[in-house]
């Protein structure tokens, strides 16, 4: 039996559940075209701010043995650049599945203005609101402030009527899973994306007795294999706590078909790849699809729905 990776997500059908994580291989229109023409099932734009941002000083992204450390600071070309791209692509490829569009304002008001621009546009895809960037100096992660998260979503859904998901930071306590899930269940969210990088880690070059990234005295977001257990826990925690209408996108530590299978088993509907995409380029999607299919066929599964969320307890 041949395994199918076909994935239905918010009334869209994708050939497979794989996509890039926002921030990786999606800064320029060239990179976005490469994603669109790759074996990825879907793709998402770089998190956009109102105006172009250079981000933090370099070095700000370093590959390390089991993953990466980054303190990018949201470099991007500004919302108009990405909105123009996705609108043109919609016209040129009207039958293609929906594009994901990411925004990450520096304040609630900026986020509201960015979302108003999307609401008023002809964009017919899926919007992701990033409430979890850990790498902008002086700007705390909104999603660690539960009251501020609720206030933000109250104001957003007062006017935003298009499909909207939010990107969350990792949580580490059952009480926090419970509190955040209760808040999110009050809103018509399309999905949550768990997780963003684990914020404010430190990697050290022993030879130089130095940190390896320049911003924030070397503190940066950790990605890759280091974060997979935390990512899986967050995917599972929200999958079991959120209304079934709110889907979960799994992000964190996916570099093989086995990693993908684990995320899906925990309940993920789609899968985003960051660190390993940065290392391998878009060819990773073809490899990881084959690996996932091989696992499914060895287990006798013909579709992802046969095992999604079916994690056994002991």
From Swiss-Prot:
Functional pathway: Pyrimidine metabolism; UMP biosynthesis via de novo pathway
Catalytic activity, reaction form: (S)-dihydroorotate + fumarate = orotate + succinate
Pfam families named in the record: DHO_dh
Cofactor needs: FMN
GO biological process: 'de novo' pyrimidine nucleobase biosynthetic process; 'de novo' UMP biosynthetic process
Cofactor note: Binds 1 FMN per subunit.
Active site location: 132 (nucleophile), 133 (nucleophile)
GO molecular function, one term: dihydroorotate dehydrogenase (fumarate) activity
Keyword field contains RNA-binding: no
Top-level lineage group: Eukaryota
Residues the entry annotates as binding FMN: 46-47, 130, 167, 195, 224, 252-253, 274-275
Protein location: Cytoplasm
Gene3D superfamilies for this protein: Aldolase class I (3.20.20.70), Dihydroorotate Dehydrogenase A, chain A, domain 2 (2.30.26.10)
This protein's GO CC annotations: cytoplasm
Family of this protein: Belongs to the dihydroorotate dehydrogenase family. Type 1 subfamily.
Function: Catalyzes the conversion of dihydroorotate to orotate with fumarate as the electron acceptor.
Protein name (database record): Dihydroorotate dehydrogenase (fumarate)
Native species: Saccharomyces paradoxus
